Amino acid sequence: PERMPYQEWPATEFPNKKSCQTSHMPAVEEETRVAVTLGLPRENMGRHTFVGGNFFMLRVLNANRNDLGVAALPKEFEAAAARTIQHLREETAKVTIDQVVVAAGRLQADLTIENLSGHKFPTAYPSRRAWLHFTVKDRNGRPVFESGAMNANGSIQGNDNDANSNQFETHYNEITSPDQVQIYEDIMVGANNIPTTGLLTAVRYIKDNRLLPRGFDKRAVDQEIAVHGEAGTDTNFIGGEDKIRYSIAVGDSQGPFQVEAEVWFQPISYRWAVNLKSYKANEPERFKAYYVSMA
């Protein structure tokens, strides 16, 4: 998947196929300078404000600039991180609460999560993950239910893979318990069928339920960009969106209830960072220290 975003793009409904550069670095409409010294202004130059999703590493570099020999100014790094966060908020995914029904001591909430991009989201490198943070509070603001809370160390409450490296969190069509979390991610396994974060030891994907772009037919695409795991048979998981229901017991809690849903994103998930502990070389140990300091 880290090399498949462009292969995912032609499988969408977007009619104007173009290069990655054309999409992410659109041409400036007027002539522009390409260097501070010498040279004449040029036409059709691509914009160089290339926004991805890795706000975390931008801030790691900025916070450890002396150790890493970073030359760019602090305000420039922070501006890039802010643009990245804005991009993630506005142009990647959107969650909508379609309806909420309370009856017989249970609350049911139906959600739709849309992919706003032209490829799978999260995109490319498998350390990235997005998940749903869903909360219900009673009329006094007291918590009744929460799924997908993030711990201070960057792990997700209820995520089996964060708690145990040999397990992983499955894809859900309905969530009924706080220890169930809808995480959009790809999970690799080695020859022993145990989850791994090692690119050289992985042999296949046991889970890939990353949000599909619009028009993507999971039944017809090549194996290289296929859906893996429970999402493959989930009829609500289709090109452009996923629908999920939260069905929870509210007991004696009094409404009206406050129901909130958010899509959260990590460019480097907890398990990928923690697994570096097994490497005793200087570089991974430095990165572990950076990760902990930023978590």
Model-found features: residue ranges?
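Primarily the internal scaffold of c-type cytochrome electron-transfer domains
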Residues: 1-228, 233-238, 244-251, 260-295
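Extracellular Ig-like/FN3 beta-sandwich strand-entry sites
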Residues: 254-256
